[in-house]
Design a protein with these regions (language model features):
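A composition-biased, non-transmembrane "mature-region" signal
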Residues: 1-149
Length: 149
């Protein structure tokens, strides 16, 4: 794995894992949906230029994260790019989203001094790890893309 792969979050399957068909990979990614996950995986619209899209909305933070995925059967890889919108600051970011989003509140403590408390928190790995795991278990490469699919 090279430095660019590390920066983009590209992961390769374990050696010896047989690559499945594109239909099986699509089914595995759609099977990630469920009541215990904080996002929804759906088929991509033609305007999104993606085969599958995972969308997560965190209302407490005013944050929307979308991962667009394109299946490339010839190379047995899923190309993924993340997009992030913040409602409060109207910021938009595209590329590979990593880290944790937090909301902090400053209030006075019982002793009268300022106190910082964490209000809401969202770890982007909670969205990407199940998707990446489904792709790697199918024997395909998860290739993070920076600019476009």
């Amino acid at each position: 794995m090279g430095i660019f792969d590390k920066l983009t979050g590209t992961r390769y399957p374990e050696t010896g894992v047989a690559a499945r068909s594109a239909a099986e990979v699509r089914a595995a990614l759609l099977a990630v949906n469920g009541p215990g996950v904080p996002f929804v995986v759906r088929n991509g619209a033609p305007s999104e230029r993606a085969d599958l899209v995972a969308v997560c909305r965190v209302r407490e933070l005013g944050l929307t994260v979308r991962t667009r995925m394109r299946l490339v059967p010839e190379q047995h890889e899923v190309r993924a790019i993340d997009e992030q919108w913040e409602a409060q600051t109207r910021e938009y970011a595209r590329g590979q989203v990593t880290g944790v989003a937090r909301d902090w509140t400053i209030e006075r403590g019982t002793d009268g001094r300022p106190q910082i408390t964490e209000g809401a928190r969202f770890d982007f790995a909670a969205m990407k790890n199940p998707l990446r795991g489904a792709v790697l278990d199918a024997g395909w490469t998860w290739r993070g893309v920076v600019f476009r699919l």
